[in-house]
A protein has these predicted regions:
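Family-specific signature for flavin-dependent thymidylate synthase
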Residues: 1-228
């Protein structure tokens, strides 16, 4: 299971959002300590009623995400607006011996399936280590590594961007890895920063009161009946 740790966030995030929102009203606030928490929370709640979410972009959260498959991080880094990434590089980090760890999907269940899966991983590891021993550079030998090898990545999202990610990745349509990671991010923010921010990280249907996956290509969800 992946591990998510919130390591840094914007100082006085509630007050920053309130002050930047007041800017739009012509009210300049330079002393963040003068802002009452209840006023800032009310401002954040009001921002949920409008499409003007700019003030939410002033608040950043930085996480360390450990033990996730590279297949997942390939998806993570597609989000570029309001996001920064710093990932373990296979050009420099050799995945030999105990460093060669990989993910096993939930549908790989039977003894025969697991046997085939582990054998494939064993062969990939052996080929990788043989290439390194033969003098092939790490950045070239990595080509034989499986896409589900575990990696670590540092990520920073602004609040508005993270809210958009949560809408999609907390949904039942999303793969379990994503749901786990965003759930942990939500818990970290709730416990370390303020519960109001955790409340903002919800599924699309919970925010918009309609399903965002109704095409013939989407899987069915138990919650869809609520919006039909």
């Amino acid at each position: 299971m992946a591990k998510v740790t919130l390591v840094s966030w914007t100082n006085k995030p509630l007050q920053v959002i309130h002050a930047m929102t007041q800017n739009m009203m012509g009210n300049i606030i330079t002393d963040l300590d003068s802002i009452k928490e209840e006023d800032a929370i009310q401002t954040i709640r009001e921002l949920q009623k409008t499409s003007l979410g700019g003030p939410l972009e002033y608040v950043d959260f930085t996480f360390q995400v450990e033990g996730v498959p590279r297949a997942l991080t390939h998806q993570m880094v597609r989000t570029r607006v309001g996001a920064v990434y710093s990932q373990e590089s296979l050009r420099f980090c050799a995945k030999t011996g105990e460093q060669f760890k990989y993910d096993i999907g939930k549908s790989v269940k039977t003894e025969e399936q697991l046997k085939v899966y582990h054998e494939a991983m064993k062969n990939a590891q052996q080929a990788y280590e043989n290439l390194l021993e033969a003098g092939v550079e790490t950045q070239d030998a990595r080509g034989v590594l499986p896409i589900n090898i575990l990696t670590n990545i540092g990520v920073k999202y602004n609040l508005k961007t993270l809210m958009g990610i949560a809408e999609v990745r907390l949904c039942t349509q999303s793969q379990p890895h994503w749901t786990d990671i965003i759930t942990q991010m939500k818990e970290e923010i709730t416990n370390k920063v303020h519960p109001i921010f955790g409340e903002l990280l919800v599924m699309y249907c919970d925010r918009h009161n309609k399903c965002g996956y109704e095409s013939i290509y989407d899987r069915k969800c138990p919650k869809q009946a609520k919006f039909q």
